[in-house]
Regions:
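Conserved positions in beta-strands of structured domains
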Residues: 24-26, 79
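Unchanged
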Residues: 51-77, 82-141
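Residues embedded in well-ordered beta-strands
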Residues: 22-24, 31-32, 103-105
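Charged phosphate-binding loop/patch that engages nucleotide di/tri-phosphates or the phosphate backbone
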Residues: 140-150
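Short connector loops at helix/strand junctions that flank enzyme active sites
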Residues: 18, 27, 39-41, 46, ...
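Conserved Nudix-box catalytic region and its N-terminal flanking loop in Nudix hydrolases
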Residues: 27-68
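Acidic, metal-coordinating catalytic segment for phosphate/diphosphate chemistry
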Residues: 1-22
């Protein structure tokens, strides 16, 4: 049972603060890797997820990339941290949370690209100027912010 599942047994749907990490991975054509997720509703998003007890944010990002894409991310560099009232959400099951999202960029990666079928439908690289329409809003904002800084 994950940390969040265990926590929810005690607090129910009450708002909690959850810490997670996302990772930007680019191919040789400078396209970003996105996954079409099963939840929420087949939207596209960046590889990433919630921190488990005892993990560093960097370890979380690397673990999630490996689990969701089959790739080993290397040379992670901090891009930005997103937090505050703009990062409040309520999941489909009614769980309320404030997300603290730590965004990394992988300078290199290796392995065979393959999606984990319980969490994602497919993986694909997209140009930053041609992101899919149906995308997790906060992930689109993160990529827009990143694109403006580059």
């Amino acid at each position: 049972m994950s940390y969040v599942e265990n926590l929810r047994k005690y607090v129910g749907h009450q708002p909690v603060i959850l810490v997670g990490a996302l990772c930007l991975l680019f191919d040789r054509e400078n396209r970003v890797l996105l996954q079409q997720r099963v939840h929420p509703h087949e939207t596209w998003g960046l590889p990433g997820g919630l921190m488990e007890l005892g993990e560093s944010a960097e370890q979380t990002a690397a673990r999630e990339v490996l689990e969701e894409t089959g790739l080993t991310a290397e040379g992670l560099e901090l891009v930005d941290v997103y937090s505050g009232k703009d990062n409040f959400a309520v999941a489909a099951n009614g769980d309320a949370f404030y997300n603290v999202t730590i965004v990394y960029r992988a300078n290199a990666y290796h392995g065979e690209l393959m999606h984990e079928e319980t969490e994602s439908i497919q993986l694909a690289f997209f140009p930053l100027k041609a992101l899919p329409e149906k995308m997790i809003g906060s992930h689109r904002r993160i990529l827009n912010d990143f694109s403006e800084k580059e």
